[in-house]
Amino acid sequence: MIYLEILVWIAIWMVAMAIIEYSIHRWTMHRKRSWLPKWIFQDHAIEHHKKERNDINIDLPLYFHILVGSPLIIASYFISLISLLTLLTVFMYHSYTWTKLHRGIHDLENNWLMKTSYFKRAKHHHELHHERPGKNFGVVFLWTDSLFRTKLK
């Protein structure tokens, strides 16, 4: 029974993480927001995209997940220990996968993910995003662009 609970929470948090990834990338990194520090838009939309600075705004460290995800961490603590541990596991997975995919896509490192067929799809998806920054916001979870109708073929 505990395994089923773990699987259910992993599924819930993976879907939540996919929507959070898409939302943050689309609505905070590609639009100036008065309530956010200016560097968020500047580093991503201007330096990384327009000036093609592939060394800026690449990594997504775990502390960012902890900071931004703190309301979810607090809520999951009150739900159950399994909810909390699976959320933290999903945060670790996403931080690692985003960083490795993004570093590989921008030729900053050669890693094991680059040998997968998923990497080829993610690279193509992300390169289209750089050509048309208003499309293809998913980095780890490519399917979110189909869901929100922002996918370029």
Q: Which positions does each model-derived feature cover?
A:
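Membrane-anchoring/interfacial helices and their immediately flanking loops
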Residues: 1-23
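Membrane-embedded catalytic scaffold of the fatty acid hydroxylase/desaturase
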Residues: 17-153
